[in-house]
Amino acid sequence: VYARGKKEFVFAGMRTKFDDANNLTYGALVQRRHVGDDAPDRFVAVIDCRGSKLARRFFTRWHEIAHRLTTHADKLEPVYRSEHDPLERLMDEIAGHVGFYEPLFDPVFRSASDGKVHLTFGVVESIIASTFPAASFQATLFACTRRVTTPVVYLEATLAHKKEVKRKLATKSLFDDDPPPGELRAVKVIQNKAAHAARFTIPTNMRVPADSVIHKLFNFEPQTDGDAQEDLSLWESQGRTLEARAVVVEARKVPGR
């Protein structure tokens, strides 16, 4: 609605970029050309809140603000870099600190987590409800994982193929065969500092074991939660399992994940 009548061609092509499944884009910062330098909307952040991207909206907003504070906007057309690009990772780091300013966030976090052995979704939701109502669950969860001293691994799982199948699907074929069904895999894995120091992780794209609460929740309705005490030795790939390690798993079903 906002872009209509603004006479800015750049807005017209954004949906195509946001729909590109091979280069996930959550937002873009635009410097408008047909407006004065003193216009309040000279710089516009466009944030994709559709589907599973909705969970990242708060973080994406601060990511684009970080661009404005540092790299500014692309004057002609936004550059849609990969989320793994070093510049984008730097913007994520800035967004995480600016969006949850430490002198304000830390006292709230300490109060909410006082007496808790592990970081839980309940702690995250308590922080949102009490002090940061505009923050998304995911962004607040990331802010919490950066501050806990216990190893935490954030994981997103969805249907995907193993690397060999992906390569075959990317190769053009004379036959229009249907692709094999995907398996539930860990498509995004993020460690906090404590987990990195302890070498505690789950390899990206590893198949989620059927006995894990993550797998059991996948076909539930969105916003369904579950938790369990599990062992990393459940995770297996090509006949090899992860090193045995007792873990507490808390999972939430969201659209597409």
Go through each PLM region and give its residues.
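Active-site hotspot residues in diverse enzymes, especially metal/ion-binding acidic/histidine motifs
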Residues: 1-257
